[in-house]
C-alpha cells in the first residue's frame, strides 16, 4: 500500500487529537504506560492542562485497546439548560448501556455539589458490576474530588512543552492528517521554523498546535512554511 493509502486507513474513525496521540512516539509512550493499571482498575481520573484534549486520550485508548469490546461513549455535563432529574436519568441510561467498553465523562465541575455527589455514587456502583473502563477528565486547577474514593487510578497527561523535540514530527503528522481528510496541498515547515517552534512553550498545548497548522494550510501561497 502507498503512504497515502496507509494514512487514509489510519485516520478512519479518528479525530485529529486521538490520531496524534496514537501516532506520535512521545504520546504513544505515555499511552502505552496506561496499559498496566488499565488491566487492574475500571475508573481513571485523567488530569491535564487545558488544550491537551483529554477526551482524545480516552478515545485513543479506546481505539488502541478496547474498540473490539464495545462502543465509546462520551458524556459532557457542559450542556446548557441542565435539568437535574432529567439529565441524571439520561446519564444513568447511557452509563448502564452494556454495549459500552469505554465511557469518558467531562465537565463534572459544572455541576452542583449535590449533583456531583449523586453521580459519583452512581459511577462507583456501575464500576463494580461492569467491565467498561470509565475515564473522568479534570484540569490541573480543579479539585480531584474523585480521588477520595478507593479503586481510582490517576493518570497525568504531560503538556506539549515536555515533548518539544517531537514538535517537528507532530507538525508533519498534523499536516498529513488534514491533507488526507480535507484535501489540502501538502506543506512542510522550514528548518528555521521547526527550530523556532521547538523552543516555543505552547501554553495552549496540542490544540494550539493544531489550530496553527489549520491556519497555515488555509494559506495557499507557499509550499514551505518559513519563520515569517
Where would I find each of the regions flagged by the language model?
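Short, flexible helix-to-coil linker/hinge segments that flank and couple to helix-turn-helix
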Residues: 172, 222-228
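As written
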Residues: 151-152
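AAA+ ATPase active-site-proximal loops
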Residues: 5-146, 159-164, 179-223
Amino acid at each position: 500500500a502507498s503512504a497515502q493509502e496507509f494514512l487514509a486507513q489510519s485516520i478512519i474513525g479518528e479525530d485529529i487529537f486521538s490520531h496524534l496521540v496514537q501516532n506520535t512516539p512521545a504520546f504513544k509512550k505515555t499511552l502505552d504506560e496506561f496499559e498496566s493499571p488499565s488491566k487492574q482498575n475500571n475508573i481513571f481520573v485523567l488530569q491535564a492542562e487545558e488544550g491537551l484534549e483529554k477526551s482524545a486520550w480516552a478515545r485513543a485508548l479506546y481505539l488502541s485497546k478496547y474498540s473490539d469490546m464495545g462502543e465509546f461513549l462520551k458524556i459532557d455535563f457542559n450542556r446548557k439548560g441542565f435539568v437535574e432529574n432529567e439529565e441524571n436519568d439520561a446519564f444513568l441510561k447511557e452509563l448502564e448501556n452494556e454495549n459500552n467498553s469505554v465511557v469518558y465523562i467531562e465537565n463534572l465541575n459544572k455541576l452542583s455539589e449535590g449533583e456531583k455527589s449523586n453521580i459519583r455514587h452512581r459511577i462507583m456502583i456501575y464500576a463494580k458490576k461492569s467491565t467498561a473502563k470509565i475515564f473522568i477528565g479534570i484540569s490541573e486547577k480543579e479539585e480531584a474530588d474523585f480521588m477520595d474514593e478507593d479503586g481510582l487510578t490517576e493518570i497525568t497527561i504531560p503538556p506539549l512543552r515536555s515533548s518539544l523535540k517531537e514538535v517537528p514530527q507532530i507538525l508533519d503528522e498534523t499536516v498529513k492528517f488534514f491533507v488526507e481528510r480535507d484535501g489540502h496541498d501538502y506543506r512542510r515547515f522550514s528548518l528555521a521554523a521547526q527550530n523556532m517552534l521547538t523552543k516555543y512553550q505552547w501554553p495552549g498545548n496540542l490544540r494550539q498546535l493544531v489550530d496553527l497548522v489549520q491556519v497555515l494550510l488555509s494559506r495557499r501561497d507557499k509550499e514551505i512554511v518559513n519563520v515569517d
